């Protein structure tokens, strides 16, 4: 079992040397994009966190917070994400964070088709695409059969491993890791994503 944490600007400045030395973390999902009133922006701590993790040999993946309800909005998010990722290498998946209440303006079929299109674009870039959401959103706002080709990163804090098929389970938002002030999200996965991506040739530099 592997432990993965995810961080964004809200964790502030992280002492990554201490995180690494703790031996508690096997990988990190960094927020690449946030959203401000529906407008995407590159997380201001992304570059700093990425550079530190690479320096220390901590496997890195990314996620971006999506508010897109149209194809042009989705494509604008992807264009900015590509700018953020160009020249970098990932050892963990690239995840689309699908949880914003504004996304409920779409039917489950329409939203799932939009998200699947984004995931296919990530794959076109040579990334391992993943979809992040929480259990109630998956049950009520998405058509999960449409998203079945992509690993699911599922948030569920009820203490029991979710029955829904998933690649990674975010089990708490109140984790504690040395080197990080305050609580942090923690996930578990049985998949050795760095080895999986390496075998598939998906850990190459993003062009």
Q: Where are the language model's segments positioned?
A:
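Functionally critical loop-and-helix segments that line ligand-binding/catalytic clefts
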Residues: 1-18, 22, 26, 143-207
